[in-house]
């Protein structure tokens, strides 16, 4: 019979907290004209990627969504991708 105390236990996996890419000293500013930056936060289907995936803070996520919607309205970004 195997003693339970003899079985090696795994160390618990701790996921490292991601930091917001728009916070900090030399962080990029969210601007609706910066299409290259905004495209990183849009999925291949043209949807805005949620903050739990991109690790953007709640305040900056709202700002980012507003900039993406403004760029779409002005024709800088597509609404849907084919």
UniProtKB/Swiss-Prot annotation:
The keyword Hydrolase does not apply. InterPro entries: Ribosomal_bS18, Ribosomal_bS18_CS, Ribosomal_bS18_sf. GO terms for molecular function: small ribosomal subunit rRNA binding; structural constituent of ribosome. SUPFAM superfamilies: Ribosomal protein S18. Keywords: Ribonucleoprotein, Ribosomal protein, RNA-binding, rRNA-binding. One of its GO terms (biological process) is translation. Residues 1-20 are annotated as: Disordered. Signal peptide: none annotated. One of its GO terms (cellular component) is cytosolic small ribosomal subunit. The keyword Membrane does not apply. It comes from the Bacteria. Pfam families: Ribosomal_S18. NCBIfam families: S18. Part of the 30S ribosomal subunit. Forms a tight heterodimer with protein bS6. Belongs to the bacterial ribosomal protein bS18 family. Binds as a heterodimer with protein bS6 to the central domain of the 16S rRNA, where it helps stabilize the platform of the 30S subunit. This is Small ribosomal subunit protein bS18. The lineage of its organism: Bacteria, Pseudomonadati, Pseudomonadota, Alphaproteobacteria, Hyphomicrobiales. The gene is rpsR.
């Amino acid at each position: 019979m195997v003693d339970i105390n003899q079985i090696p236990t795994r160390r618990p996996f701790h996921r490292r907290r991601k930091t917001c890419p728009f916070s900090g000293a030399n962080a990029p500013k969210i601007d609706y004209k910066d299409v290259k930056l905004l495209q990183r936060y849009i999925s291949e289907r043209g949807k805005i990627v949620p903050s739990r995936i991109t690790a953007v803070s709640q305040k900056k996520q709202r700002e980012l969504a507003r900039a993406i919607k403004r760029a779409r309205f002005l024709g800088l970004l597509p609404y849907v991708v084919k």
